[in-house]
Amino acid sequence: MTWIKICGTTSERDADIAIRAGANALGFIMAPSPRQVTDTMAYSIGTVAPKEVERIGVFVNEELTVLAQIARFCKFTGVQLHGDETAEYIAELRTLLPGMKMLKSVTIDELANRMPASGCRFPPRPRDNVPDAWLLDQRTPEKRGGTGQTFDWERAKSLLRNPAQPVIVAGGLNARNVGAALATLHPWGVDVASGVESFPGRKHPGAVAQFIDAVRQFDSANSAQASRAQKGSEL
């Protein structure tokens, strides 16, 4: 089943909307953004989430000890590094936050530079300087995320064949196009912010529900297709 993160959560209301709709994770932006929250806000909002819903703090080039302190205070279950963080940064962060999930955002160009065109060749975990999952996002000179723009899915398709690590797709997703993104890329997870909002920082209940429904419909159809293929191979 596709992992779904609703990012840019700014209130208990929005957290409740995402949780009731079936999100697997909430994202809290701790860097300058229209969706930025304070550590106190993130902690308070996170208390409404049941244990099975992950709480991911999103950081951009934060000082290591500061990030670790915030993550502990907010009781995040994971952190998403959305800046220029290096492999050495990730390794050191793991010593400060042992056992915490680490996600690292990359653009399609950065992803292409990390592997041959023939397929995904990420070093498998548990190497300390490698994140647990890569988040493939669109970026502009003005914004590192939350652009509302998609990237070239066809170009990315060849890079996501048989990945050794999970890949999460973000960038311009909404209920209308997430099915096509899933069919093209078959990622481990999807991440959405602007595509389910009334305006930046305010989630639209209907848009959140429709997005998650679209993902689950794809999952159901994909599972049924796999089941039919399995039965056919047994004949």
Predicted regions and their residues:
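Internal alpha/beta core interface subdomains
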Residues: 165, 176, 182, 187-191
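C-terminal helical cap(s) of enzyme catalytic domains, especially alpha/beta-barrels
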Residues: 40-49, 92-93, 193-235
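Glycine-rich beta-strand-to-loop/alpha-helix junction loops that act as flexible
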Residues: 7, 82, 169-173, 193-196
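A short, Lys/Arg-enriched amphipathic alpha-helix followed by its capping loop at the start of a domain
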Residues: 17-23
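Extreme N-terminal starter segment of soluble prokaryotic enzymes
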Residues: 1-4
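Conserved anion-binding
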Residues: 25-34, 40-41, 47-164, 168-169, ...
